[in-house]
Amino acid sequence: MWKSKRNVQITYTLLPPSSQTIPAEQTDRLDDVVSYQSLDSAKVSTVHGVDKIAGSHDAWDWRGRGWLVIAGSHWEVLGWGEEEGGNAWCVTYFAKTLFTPAGIDFYSRGRQGLRPETVEAIKEGLAGIEDVKDLAGSVFEIKVDDGN
């Protein structure tokens, strides 16, 4: 889905828990907004959804909002860390949906993305995990420019 996109940004915001028995600081729900541009357009598009914990705190189920309410997906945090200099990163696995194949995403808090050596180290680590090693080889970089 992202190969034809650029300037992808994902913003997660805590939502009130689904139950009053869950402390607010341990909420089981996130507001999830993705903005992006196509490679050849200045228009910014958005996808809005809600993530809800799916079992463990590392697994989430996403449900679209608006016309995407029919869409859903499952994703899991595989790892996270911080580069020298403070650029935080996270790696997620997402399951196949009606619209996308299964895959792996690398997230970077910094707009500049991850250093090549960080990307290679993460890929090496993923190559040792049987369930995701094939997907690790298909990771690609998303274009970032001054458009968004």
Q: Model regions: which residues?
A:
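A beta-rich soluble binding module of mature secreted/lumenal proteins
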Residues: 1-148
